[in-house]
């Protein structure tokens, strides 16, 4: 899959100019320098040989090597813009954390890096929110395509084809390329960082 639009997360955090509200599909690219740390918690379950041989999931962006680890759809009323705001600018509140309203991708990255979302029982861990934002600002680039005429079902079909024609270990739902054990492990560690002791 070739994506037309591209912007570093740090730039998107500063300004949403040029990002439209059309529905579409997007891809998260992670700097290769961060992969060992990011995937350490699930290293025994990630097929690194498979990941390394997926040529379409590797490229040089802005002078650094990147690997695509996650693909998603933006089918809501605010399309790509709304989805990026949710993934990038979402505030961690006690209610959002407890009710599971934090973006699954934010929870997954936080869990993999052991950034606890709550502390002292029921207080938001603002340091973890800041650490997560810094991590994605320094290590992630987003690419996307708009599909203004596609329905949510059509977008899900395209997303499914992309996920299952490659190896995207951070995609859980509908991903036939990762093991049940890995899905269970990701769910477990996501629950751990959101739980109240």
Region spans (language model):
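Boundary/linker segments flanking structured domains
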Residues: 1-197
């Amino acid at each position: 899959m070739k994506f037309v639009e591209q912007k570093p997360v740090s730039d998107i955090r500063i300004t949403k100019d040029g990002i439209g509200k059309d529905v579409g599909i997007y891809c998260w690219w992670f700097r290769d320098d961060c992969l060992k740390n990011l995937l350490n918690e699930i290293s025994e379950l990630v097929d690194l040989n498979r990941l390394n041989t997926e040529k379409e999931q590797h490229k040089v962006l802005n002078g650094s090597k990147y690997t695509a680890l996650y693909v998603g759809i933006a089918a809501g009323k605010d399309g790509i813009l709304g989805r990026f705001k949710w993934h990038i600018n979402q505030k961690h509140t006690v209610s959002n954390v407890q009710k599971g309203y934090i973006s699954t991708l934010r929870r997954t990255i936080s869990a993999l890096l052991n950034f606890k979302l709550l502390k002292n029982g029921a207080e938001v861990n603002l340091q973890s929110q800041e650490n997560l934002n810094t991590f994605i600002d320094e290590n992630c680039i987003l690419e996307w395509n708009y599909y203004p005429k596609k329905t949510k079902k059509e977008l899900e079909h395209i997303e499914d084809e992309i996920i299952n024609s490659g190896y995207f270990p951070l995609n859980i739902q509908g991903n036939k390329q990762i093991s049940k054990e890995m899905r269970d492990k990701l769910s477990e560690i996501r629950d751990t960082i959101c739980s109240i002791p």
